[in-house]
Amino acid sequence: SKKLSLFSDKTEIIPCGVNLNLFKPIDKLASRDKLGLDHNYNYVLFSSSFNNKIKNAALAKLALSNFENIILLEMKGYSREEVHLLMNAVDILIVTSHSETGPLVVKEALACNCPIISTDVGDVKELAKGVENCYIVDYDAKHIEQRIRDILSSNKKSDGRAAVKHFGLEKIATDVYSVYKRVLK
């Protein structure tokens, strides 16, 4: 607030970058094969561990309770390469968190053109603005359920990669370097 406004001319916000060389769209069925996922199901990737209370897995599970052919996957214990495969193998990333900073997982999903359903946390609303098959939702299981149905019936990926191209690691490194140069002058 007041303290921050005193230093606003000396403040620079640099977001977390995304490895756009790794997180990119690849074939869904090939990704499922590599992960051992059945082609006969729809998959929704939960953004974190089910045990993390802030991430609100209960809401995601409730929203999916009326579906028989959907498997909710927990993003826990995967390498970065496996997360990339997951983003391409699943039909939807779901974020039902009570709070977030970024979240980086949304940027990675966008880079893979993975459809997203998210509560209004962190900078998700700004990131998803104008992106096809990316929805900001209330903490309402029925609303989330409807958005899941919308995405599955469209049978389309998102067009999110363009929304995160300025979060590439090279761009972020250049931004950090620029800040250091200004500070050292």
Task: Give residue ranges: language-model regions.
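Conserved donor-binding/catalytic core segment of Leloir-type glycosyltransferases
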Residues: 18, 38-55, 61-64
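Conserved acidic donor-binding segment of nucleotide-sugar-dependent glycosyltransferases
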Residues: 130-142, 150-153
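Aromatic "clamp/platform" in nucleotide-sugar-dependent glycosyltransferases that forms part
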Residues: 98
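Short alpha-helical donor nucleotide-sugar binding micro-motif in glycosyltransferases
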Residues: 85-90
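A short helix/loop element that forms part of the nucleotide-sugar donor recognition site in Leloir-type
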Residues: 24-37, 158
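A charged, aromatic-enriched C-terminal amphipathic alpha-helix characteristic of glycosyltransferases
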Residues: 155-182
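Short hydrophobic beta-strand element within catalytic cores of glycosyltransferases
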Residues: 115-118
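A short, active-site helix/loop in glycosyltransferases that binds the activated sugar's phosphate group
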Residues: 1-10, 18, 22
